[in-house]
Regions:
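N-terminal accessory beta-strand-rich subdomains and adjacent acidic, glycine-rich linkers
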Residues: 11-183
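Bacterial Sec-dependent N-terminal signal peptides
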Residues: 1-10
Length: 183
């Protein structure tokens, strides 16, 4: 059984090892991904892009040169963690694009992640990363907001011990002017 299928020449489907999570990555005018859990859409097609200092945008009109997949099922020793070993099990989809870059998606049983990969030999700076999260419903979220600093400005939110109380609210009720962190 394949974990990656070509769809309409621009869409690629990747499933988690258990098959419960599925993401479809599409390379059209934009690079997009979606997410489904047990066949239920939890994220609609959402764009990804990186803007470089020379004006290049990885993710705008991407052209796939080559696509391949791999599966990993291994353990790593973890002498400083609460478990002696960490189990690493995922399926991956790598899309190599024209222009010297690629995007890799990994589907684990409990989540999907991505990363941009460069084969460009000259130095560059990333000016902006665009990542959308287009939810089909106004889901409820539990969010730990970063405490604002004494001056109340945006930068003061970066000085943080990552300890805080959590706010539970619909996505539409979250504060876009506040930083949050992952628990």
């Amino acid at each position: 059984m394949g974990i990656c299928e070509l769809q309409a020449q621009t869409g690629y489907t990747l499933s988690s090892p258990s098959g419960r999570l599925r993401t479809t990555v599409a390379a059209g005018e934009e690079l997009t991904y979606d997410l489904a859990l047990d066949g239920r859409t939890v994220m609609e097609p959402s764009a990804l892009a990186l803007e470089l200092d020379d004006g290049t945008v990885w993710g705008r009109n991407p052209r796939v040169k080559r696509a391949w997949r791999t599966s990993v099922d291994t353990t790593h020793p973890s002498p400083l963690y609460r478990s002696a070993e960490v189990h690493d099990r995922y399926n991956a989809l790598i899309l190599e694009m024209k222009g010297g870059w690629a995007v890799e998606f990994r589907a684990y049983d409990d989540g999907v992640g991505y990363r941009f990969v460069s084969s460009v030999r000259k130095p560059f700076h990333i000016m902006n990363e665009r990542v959308e999260y287009r939810f089909p419903h106004d889901f409820e979220a539990t969010v730990p907001y970063v405490k604002t600093g004494a001056d109340g400005n945006w930068e003061s939110q970066y000085h943080n011990s990552f300890e805080n109380t959590y706010t539970t609210a619909p996505l539409s009720g979250l504060n876009p002017g506040r930083l949050a962190f992952l628990p």
